[in-house]
């Protein structure tokens, strides 16, 4: 039986990129309550040591469980790559991670050349290496670490000259190699979709796994008898480890929603 008094679903990211995943969850599961945690004090994770990312992600998820979350979505490719296996071994709730959509991109590509834009840590992770190896021979993957993109997006710059200049540097080698498909391998990057389309037109088909993550979450909720009853009124909560006002502003700018947000302390952070 669906629970008529549902606990929230925790959605975690190092910063604001996970809002792109939250958007898809809210669209698919309108009655579920969501607790969004942005670890903006320590963002971005993409260039942090692996040991820090792993320990900090576990610390953040333990905080979410203490708030009563019934399931967790790790809406951060870097955190998923370094920590999701540890989380599943350690924590007693369903955990849904994210990973770059290499498989659907390879299937969609006509040229069999696929561009992958992701953080440096995602590209270095063992999880990504295994995913790439599993698709050996299906397509050629041109991988670029999107250095500098996340801080600009966190500041609200999704269409300015700085971000366009960086995108041009990353996309040009892909196009020159014959790529016709682009994997958005960081949850921040869907907020750049309109800018990328403006820059490259229909030369690249964009692959974003946000909707697939939402569907996987829905399946897990049913599988574990955690789904909310239809008609329940969701109670969402948005928290940040650094700047609640900025989180509120960016939720309004990126998702077009008005919400309250609060600042929380999850300390001490791991020392690495």
UniProtKB/Swiss-Prot annotation:
Active-site annotation: 76, 186
Keyword annotations: Cell shape, Cell wall biogenesis/degradation, Isomerase, Peptidoglycan synthesis
EC number: 5.1.1.3
BP term (GO), one: regulation of cell shape
Pathway in which this enzyme or protein is active: Cell wall biogenesis; peptidoglycan biosynthesis
UniProt catalytic activity: L-glutamate = D-glutamate
GO MF annotation list: glutamate racemase activity
Chain sites annotated for binding substrate: 13-14, 45-46, 77-78, 187-188
Functional description taken from the UniProt entry: Provides the (R)-glutamate required for cell wall biosynthesis.
Family: Belongs to the aspartate/glutamate racemases family.
Protein name: Glutamate racemase
Organism: Cupriavidus pinatubonensis (strain JMP 134 / LMG 1197)
